[in-house]
Amino acid sequence: MLGKVERSEMYILFAMTQVLLVDKISGITSHTAVAKIRHLTGVKKIGHCGTLDPAACGLLIMGCGTATRLIRYMSNLDKRYIATITLGTQTTTDDSEGEIIYSAPKPSLDKITLESIGRAAEKLSGTIKQIPSAYSAIKVSGNRAYNLARQGIIPKLNAREVRVHWKFLGDFENNQVHVQITCSSGTYVRALARDMGKFLGVGGHLSYLKRLSIGPFHLHEIYREINKKEATMSERTPSGNTQGLTDNMAISDNMAISESDKHDCTEPGINCTELGIKDTCTALREVHYTQGDTLSFTRLTALQALSRIYKPIEVSQKQADDLSCGRYISLGIDSNGPVCAVCKENLIAVIQPVSAGLWRPETVLSDNRKLNSNAAQDASGST
């Protein structure tokens, strides 16, 4: 077995790492996933973006420590899912967790073809107006919609504008259609399943959902890193024997990987090779929340995460000091939107253009002790 990682070491590791890409499995809430990561790392300040329903699985992004301030920049990114829609039954929650409130007669279902499903998808493609599911976290007069729905009160929810793109995966069999959906933030895939069933006149609900990506962050990154680590560990230890590995490697790799830890990543109609995923990927057993169940994740620094969203721009020590104090800086760059200002990885900031060449800090992550130390070194070196 690998040496045990002390909680204080784990705290330092995650406080520095800051951004996690987590593979949430079905059966737990996003809040529970955060709580388990919080318990593992000892970092109290952890937040997430893009809540997944308990029955859903896939990519969940978390920010640790000061990186929680970066979540706002990830929340509005487009998302990509694979989903299974079951036609012929409508439920109270628009997914398989709810009670069935309508079942279509068999003759009606027999008329459904992949072509008619395609026409329904066309109606639900592009920029559309969508009414969210009644069982949602949207607030209505201060109350969550799902709380009202559970009391038998059907909340009146306003339609919202969303963008949706469909891709069909395989044939229509057993009243189920498998799809890949790319959509804007705020889209309810459950509502898409409901509306497809409504358009076809047979009812429908979401029976499976997995999130593959949020903007430039992808689920397969978790397993790509794990596969790399597995290969490295195999090279270092004959016959996969992990005896004698150092605590340092325990901090890096967290846990030994065994054949029993194989995680089947194959999905119906999905070409795993195209997604960069092996047919069978090895999942690190990093967070145990019930017997035999775990969460798998990989880590990014705040800079790695933010530079995927905004163009990184190197700034001087003086400019970094100004930004950390909330002052505007001048930059000779042309951009209509925000950029990521970086100073020797001691400061990371999202800055917005004010006027030609003038930029204001919007969100700043900095270590003033390092900044001041570097500034002093620069000053002494110039005298």
From Swiss-Prot:
Keyword list, A-Z: Isomerase, tRNA processing
EC number(s) given by UniProt: 5.4.99.25
Alphabetized InterPro entries for the sequence: PsdUridine_synth_cat_dom_sf, PsdUridine_synth_N, tRNA_psdUridine_synth_TruB
Domain of life: Bacteria
Active site: residue positions: D53
Reactions this protein catalyses: uridine(55) in tRNA = pseudouridine(55) in tRNA
CDD domains per UniProt: PseudoU_synth_EcTruB
GO molecular function annotation: RNA binding; tRNA pseudouridine(55) synthase activity
Listed GO biological process terms: mRNA pseudouridine synthesis; tRNA pseudouridine synthesis
SUPFAM superfamilies: Pseudouridine synthase (SSF55120)
Stored Gene3D superfamilies: Pseudouridine synthase (3.30.2350.10)
S-adenosyl-L-methionine is among the record's keywords: no
One Pfam family it belongs to: TruB_N
Protein family (similarity comment): Belongs to the pseudouridine synthase TruB family. Type 1 subfamily.
UniProt function note: Responsible for synthesis of pseudouridine from uracil-55 in the psi GC loop of transfer RNAs.
Protein name as catalogued: tRNA pseudouridine synthase B
Annotated source species: Tropheryma whipplei (strain TW08/27) (Whipple's bacillus)
Top-level taxonomy: Bacteria, Bacillati, Actinomycetota, Actinomycetes, Micrococcales
Designated gene of the protein: truB
